[in-house]
A protein has these predicted regions:
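Conserved phosphate/anionic-ligand binding catalytic regions in large, soluble enzymes, centered on
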Residues: 61-81, 180-192, 196
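Hydrophobic alpha-helical positions that pack around
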Residues: 144-271, 283-286
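Short coil/turn connectors at secondary-structure junctions
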Residues: 15, 53, 61, 85-89, ...
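Short amphipathic, charge-patterned alpha-helical segments
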Residues: 119-123, 272-289
Length: 318
């Protein structure tokens, strides 16, 4: 596989921290005071004043895709919600990060929980959800406690619960811990578990979550990273977001790198602006001294192992 080091005369690959804007900042903590000091919940306060149809249209114009792996356009997913059923609409934030070695959402949960909460509440208002749920990986015990505390802080300040930001909109968030079941990464399996049943994926159709989801009600299931994009879309505008990075998959993606590299970690990179070789050499510092790359697992343990000397072709922008 040809993964050449970036040329000396080219601009080195850099991060573009939008979702990770607070991660690793000196003096930053998970408190609501710190989040408010950087303009936190300002987008939510403006969101509840805007027409819902306009907000959903902005998400569709942004072309932002789900960050959980399936890559389905978020605006299209919301468009499928059955708003005429007379049943309540639910939103589930999928924080069941169970792919071995994956922990991109964990950083947001532990260090920036209020960004997640603001994203959830902005999304809930846009789709007129009656209740939101966060389904968190069972092993994230401290993360569960951090989210519970953050939600209580937000509720006390009027950002969650009744009359959000002084409006007539009411919506609360419930956090539910999983039990270490890998299949809950699939949305219908997650819904079955959240409803108290066995975490078993359901047949589509008829069980499209947008039509027949949690408690057989219309349900939107969005990943942690995805909901964090919602305030950015409402603040910047859908068209502006659609111009960030690759047109087929706008925005940024958080990439986690582990193994024998000099700087393992999570890196937020604009789509289409960094090759795998640049990520490994420039951002991660290359292999440890005296070691060399032999193979790469590009998407977790469920993917094919790519040999270092193997040649391959990327067939599309995704």
């Amino acid at each position: 596989m040809n993964l050449p080091h970036i040329k000396d005369d080219a601009m080195p690959a850099k991060e573009n921290r939008i979702i990770y804007s607070h991660i690793g900042l000196e003096g930053w903590n998970a408190s609501i005071e710190k989040y408010l000091s950087d303009g936190g919940y300002a987008v939510l306060a403006e969101t509840v004043k805007r027409p819902r149809e306009e907000l959903c249209a902005e998400v569709e114009k942004s072309k932002i895709k789900g960050r959980g792996g399936a890559g389905f356009p978020t605006g299209t997913k919301w468009k499928f919600l059955d708003r005429k059923s007379g049943k309540p609409i639910y939103l589930i934030c999928n924080a069941d990060e169970s792919e071995p070695g994956t922990c991109k959402d964990r950083l947001l949960i532990y260090q920036d929980p209020h960004k997640i909460i603001e994203g959830i509440m902005c999304a809930c208002y846009a789709i007129n959800a009656a209740q939101a749920f966060i389904y968190i990986r069972g092993e994230y015990i401290n993360g569960y406690r951090i989210l519970q505390k953050a939600i209580a802080e937000a509720r006390e300040r009027g950002f969650v619960g009744k009359n959000i930001c002084g409006s007539d909109y009411c919506c609360d968030i419930t956090v539910s811990r999983g039990a270490g079941c890998y299949v809950c990464g699939e949305e219908t399996g997650l819904i079955s578990s959240l409803a108290g049943g066995r975490a078993y994926p359901r047949i589509k159709p008829p069980y499209f979550p947008a039509v027949k989801g949690l408690y057989d009600c219309p349900t939107a299931v969005n990943n942690v990273e995805t909901v964090c994009w919602i305030p950015e879309i409402f603040k910047r505008g859908g068209e502006a977001v659609s111009k960030i990075g690759c047109p087929a998959d706008p925005g940024t993606h958080v990439w986690g790198v582990s193994g024998l590299v000099q700087k393992p970690g999570r890196y937020e990179i604009t789509t289409g602006e960094c090759t795998l070789g640049e990520l490994l050499h420039d951002l991660c510092g290359g292999p440890l001294p005296g070691r060399r790359f032999k193979a790469i697992i590009p998407g977790g343990s469920s993917m094919k192992i790519l040999r270092w000397d193997e040649k391959f072709t990327v067939k599309n922008a995704d």
